Amino acid sequence: FVNQMQEGYYKNIVNAFLSKYETEFYRHPAASRMHHAFISGLAQHVYEMLKIAAVYCDMYEMLNRELVYAGIILHDMGKLFEMTCENLVSTEYTLEGLMVGHISMMVSLIDEMSKELECEGEESILLKHMIIAHHGKLEWGSPKEPMIAEAELVHYLDVVSAKMTALETAFK
């Protein structure tokens, strides 16, 4: 999916994060209990979301595919620092994970990476909004609710992937 992205900020920042954290990204669970709580769960969760997003981006031309893909790939990457995954089986929350959370942690990481890439404009703000809004509602842990179509889509795809995998696990 990254190869389908047009050259520019979103592709550059995604490539920078994947290059830096590739091993952790592909082996880390997406959660400790609720969904994708298994080895490589984070990568599977992201892949499921990207597959569905591709259909929506084809269907709705107003969507910025690069922003959607970048938002999906990075939305839970803060979990690499929110939870430990020492033995690839059990996860525990780090102190920073408990006190700050993966959303705030990822926004800080995007700020740092954007500075390194020398791109801190509107695209960076939109990407941070994707991260901040992906839980959808304030009461579900989002500091802001989605304010653009791309953020709304990422929120719903996050919910669908999480719920379907939880149901699939329950029925096994």
Question: Where do the language-model regions lie?
Answer:
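Acidic/His-rich, divalent-metal-binding segments that scaffold phosphate/diphosphate chemistry
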Residues: F1-G97, K137
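Divalent metal-dependent catalytic cores for phosphoryl transfer on phosphate-bearing substrates
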Residues: V55-A170
